[in-house]
C-alpha cells in the first residue's frame, strides 16, 4: 500500500494521523510542516488561524475552538489541520521567501502528503487571503470558504503598512512573514483575479468587523456587505453575521452551520 493510500486508510478510521513532511526548499533550508488528518469524506483544509493540536509550547489557546470545528465537521469530511504559517526558527528561515507563491506551494505539498488530490479550503482573516491565492493559482480546490476577509475591494497596500508596523513592534520573524506576504500583493488586482474563479465559493464576516491599526482602517464586514450584490453576481454565497467582530472564527457553533449549508450540497453525495 502506497503512503498516500495509508494516510487515507488511517483517516478513515476516525483518528488523527500526525505526519511531518519536508516541503519546498527556501535557500539552503527545508520547511517541515506538521499536520493532522481527521475523519473521512471529501478533504477539507481548516487553514489559519486554526492549527494542528499540541503544537505550541505551553499549550494551544485555540485547542477548544479547533475541537469545536472538528466535532461539527468530521462526521462527513476528512479534515486536515496543519501548523502554518511557520513559527520559531522555521519562520526565520522563511521570511525572505514567504510570498503567496511559496505559501501556496507549501500547502499543496501538504495536500499531496495527506493524499488530497482535490480539497476544499476554509481560512479566516489571513487564512482567507491564502484561500484567494490558492483559488487563483491551482485547479485543485473543490470549494473555497473565505472568512473574515473581503474577496474583492481589499486594500493590500494598507495591509502591508499594518504588517510593517506590527513587525517593527513585535520584532519577531513570525510578524515579518506577513510583511513579505502582503508586500508581494500590493499590485494584486483582486477583482480581476476573483472574476476568473470557477470553484464553488462562499465568503462570510461579522458586520462589525473593522480593524484600525497603524493609522489604517481595514473594513472587512462592512466592505463585504457593500459588495454583496457584486459578489453574488460573481457566483459567491455571502453571509454577514450581526453582533460580532473579527473574533467570529472563535465561535464554531455559529460558523460551522454556515460552512455546512454551503459545502454539503456541493461536496456530499446522497
Regions found by a protein language model. Give the residues of each.
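Short beta-strand/loop motif that positions the catalytic acidic residue
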Residues: 197, 203-205
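Conserved hydrolase catalytic core segment
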Residues: 118-152
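Conserved acidic catalytic loop of the alpha/beta-hydrolase fold
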Residues: 102-119
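Conserved HGGG/HGGXW glycine-rich cap/lid loop of the alpha/beta-hydrolase fold
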Residues: 31-89
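Catalytic active-site module of serine/aspartate enzymes centered on a nucleophile-bearing elbow/loop
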Residues: 234-270
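Flexible "cap/lid" loop of the alpha/beta hydrolase fold
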Residues: 144-166
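Conserved loop-alpha-helix segment in the C-terminal half of the alpha/beta-hydrolase fold
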Residues: 207-237
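N-terminal export signals
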Residues: 5-23
Amino acid at each position: 500500500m502506497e503512503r498516500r493510500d495509508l494516510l487515507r486508510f488511517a483517516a478513515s478510521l476516525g483518528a488523527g494521523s500526525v505526519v511531518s513532511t519536508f516541503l519546498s526548499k527556501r535557500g539552503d533550508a527545508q520547511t517541515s510542516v506538521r499536520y493532522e488528518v481527521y475523519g473521512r469524506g471529501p478533504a477539507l483544509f481548516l487553514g489559519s488561524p486554526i492549527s494542528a493540536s499540541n503544537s505550541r509550547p505551553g499549550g494551544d489557546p485555540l485547542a477548544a475552538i479547533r475541537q469545536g470545528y472538528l466535532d461539527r465537521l468530521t462526521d462527513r469530511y476528512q479534515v486536515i489541520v496543519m501548523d502554518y504559517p511557520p513559527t520559531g526558527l522555521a519562520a526565520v528561515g522563511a521570511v525572505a521567501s514567504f510570498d503567496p507563491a511559496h505559501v501556496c506551494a507549501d500547502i499543496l505539498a501538504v495536500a499531496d502528503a495527506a493524499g488530497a488530490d482535490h480539497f476544499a479550503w476554509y481560512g479566516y482573516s489571513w487564512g482567507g487571503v491564502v484561500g484567494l491565492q490558492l483559488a487563483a493559482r491551482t485547479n485543485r480546490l473543490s470549494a473555497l470558504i473565505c472568512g473574515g476577509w473581503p474577496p474583492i475591494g481589499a486594500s493590500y497596500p494598507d495591509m502591508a503598512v499594518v504588517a510593517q508596523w506590527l513587525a517593527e513592534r513585535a520584532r519577531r520573524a513570525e510578524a515579518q512573514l506577513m510583511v513579505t506576504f502582503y508586500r508581494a500583493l500590493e499590485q494584486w488586482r483582486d477583482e480581476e483575479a476573483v472574476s476568473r474563479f470557477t470553484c464553488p465559493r462562499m465568503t462570510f464576516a461579522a458586520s462589525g468587523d473593522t480593524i484600525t491599526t497603524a493609522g489604517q482602517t481595514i473594513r472587512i464586514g462592512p466592505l463585504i456587505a457593500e459588495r454583496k450584490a457584486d459578489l453574488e453576481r460573481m457566483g459567491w454565497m455571502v453571509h454577514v453575521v450581526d453582533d460580532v467582530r473579527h473574533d467570529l472564527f472563535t465561535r464554531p457553533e455559529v460558523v460551522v452551520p454556515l460552512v455546512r449549508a454551503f459545502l454539503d450540497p456541493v461536496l456530499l453525495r446522497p
